[in-house]
Amino acid sequence: MGIDLVKAGRVKKPGRKALVSKNPYLRLLVKLFKFLARRTDFPFNKIVLKRLLMPRRYKAPLSLSKLSKHMESRPNNTAVVIGTVTSDERMDVVPKLSVCALRVTETARKRILASGGEVLTFDQLVARSPIGGKCTLLRGETKAREAVKHFRNEVKGNPKPYVRSKGRKFEKARGRRHSRAFKA
């Protein structure tokens, strides 16, 4: 008896193995972290490499408020974000932070530096800590995108409709209210 192979054994492993982006800086970073992932036995470099290879929608932005909340309990660590660090106007005082990210918005950079913190690039981070010691990997919420609100197609998932207008006549009746036949 043979084993039942899905698609006759031609199933590829998930996840990207190569960078799709044409960004030369990103290409250099991938080259650097491929080398480090191969030569060091620490999972930090493998995780950073995996996240660098991800599509842009998985490099979600992280606000300064969330960043500072995560770093409260780790005052001497460097926050590593494979994505963008954005400013948050609701935050009055930014604590002293050490941040390494692919991109940092202009306002966020000014606020971090004004509080006595530092903003590092990935090559500076590698020079300082090649095995990821005293580093905390953080990521933004990938499901917070506007597009994701339209995807909920499970039962009672309440997906957001694509409508040209939000008036009385537009996708407000059948299937949306119990009083109009049924509510999905």
UniProtKB/Swiss-Prot annotation:
GO terms of molecular function: RNA binding; structural constituent of ribosome
SUPFAM superfamilies reported for this sequence: Ribosomal proteins L15p and L18e
UniProt key word DNA-binding: no
InterPro entries named in the record: Ribosomal_eL18, Ribosomal_uL15/eL18, Ribosomal_uL15/eL18_sf
Disordered: annotated span: 156-184
Keyword tags: Cytoplasm, Ribonucleoprotein, Ribosomal protein
Compartments where located: Cytoplasm
Positions with biased composition (Basic residues): 174-184
A GO CC term attached to the entry: cytosolic large ribosomal subunit
Keyword Protein biosynthesis annotated: no
Gene Ontology biological process terms from the UniProt entry: translation
Recorded family membership: Belongs to the eukaryotic ribosomal protein eL18 family.
PANTHER family in the cross-refs: 60S RIBOSOMAL PROTEIN L18 (PTHR10934), LARGE RIBOSOMAL SUBUNIT PROTEIN EL18 (PTHR10934:SF2)
Name of the featured protein: Large ribosomal subunit protein eL18
Gene coding for it: RPL18
